Amino acid sequence: MAVAYLVTFILGAASGAIHPACYAYIGALLPLVFAFIYLYTCTLIRGFGAAIALNGFILVLFLIAGEADPGYIIATVVITALAELLRKAFGYDTKKGVRWSFIPFAFSFFAYISHWWTDTEGSLAAAVEEMPAGYDQLMIPVIDNILMLIVVLVLTIPVAILAMRLAERSLKKPAATLK
């Protein structure tokens, strides 16, 4: 499941090839895939560690690849810890525990792209080096549109709730093992 999670992350990051707005806001739609991976992982890891296994795998790979900046590391640790705490509070072997813990977990991709707002100058400089000419200029209005970022972050919550319900209905056999 960790490999599927990595592939989903990579596809999310690759959406930036279309337009910077895709990269910045795809995180609101990725929970539609993350939910299936997270639910199945939670049915395999019945106690502490499902969120850590998934986000830890990505974090280690990104550290090795040089893709993990301090903003990403901090945000990932906070999101993962919150997901683990909620799952413990509501029950490791319950649907309620998985549902509640998935809400913070759903924001995992936003941790990865947080550098746009925590290190804007560095992100723009990297875009000049790594992306086609003019990409950095396309990024500026996206980065400056804080209202849209807030709207997308807020919309991630109902998307996460809906996504987990869809995952439960689609993965009936694994979901049935939860109380």
Locate the predicted segments by residue.
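Short helix-perturbing small/polar motifs within transmembrane alpha-helices
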Residues: 2-7, 76-114, 160-164
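Interfacial aromatic-anchored transmembrane helix boundaries in multi-pass membrane proteins
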Residues: 13-16, 23, 58-85
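Hydrophobic transmembrane alpha-helices
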Residues: 1-49
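Membrane-embedded alpha-helical hairpins and interfacial helices in multi-pass inner-membrane proteins
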Residues: 23, 98-173
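Membrane-helix interface segments
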Residues: 48-52, 69, 94-96
